[in-house]
A protein has these predicted regions:
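Phosphate- and other anionic-substrate recognition elements at nucleic-acid/protein interfaces
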Residues: 1-166
Length: 166
């Protein structure tokens, strides 16, 4: 795990790794019919969001204050990576943690670290931030997909989220 802040640095790291699939922990699409993140009148949820809710998984909608900038950055990063011929998917570590039965970072970083270790993840050391632990969880989601143990929820024409099969 390595923290990077600028898109250019992230893309450089990705080029070095040459992944088969990239999971981004941010909304990568807007609800169908929504004109932008600042649109006050458009739909608030995507089908994939509603499917999370049906499964009892809590999330922040793309229209919520701080999620707006995260959504914009996610969409722009996805576009940059796809132009470089990478396959990019949306992941939600909170959903993966809930489905796999490990605590979210809101319950405490030590509990999340221990949960990741129980899953067999090596290198989960003290001092990793909540964002880094979520990045590890995102990578687990992608690995599960590559092993046939994860699925997409939502509508392909609106947006999909990759989650472990329950």
């Amino acid at each position: 795990v390595k923290e990077v802040y600028l898109d250019e640095d992230l893309i450089s790291e990705i080029r070095d790794m040459r992944p088969k699939l990239i999971g981004i922990d941010a909304p990568l699409t807007l609800p169908r019919g929504r004109r932008g993140v600042e649109d006050k009148e458009g739909p608030k949820f995507r089908l994939c969001d509603l499917e999370l809710r049906e499964r009892g998984i809590k999330f922040f909608p793309v229209t919520l204050g701080p999620m707006r900038s995260l959504t914009l950055r996610g969409i722009m990063l996805k576009e940059k990576l796809e132009k470089l011929n990478y396959r990019v998917v949306e992941v939600y570590p909170g959903a993966t943690q809930d489905i796999l039965g490990i605590p979210r970072k809101s319950r405490g970083l030590s509990l999340l670290r221990e949960g990741l270790r129980r899953l067999g993840v090596r290198g989960v050391r003290e001092g990793l931030s909540g964002d880094e632990l979520d990045a590890i969880t995102a990578a687990i989601t992608v690995q599960l997909y590559l092993e046939g143990k994860a699925e997409f929820i939502g509508d392909p024409t609106e947006g999909l989220i990759l989650i472990p099969k329950g």
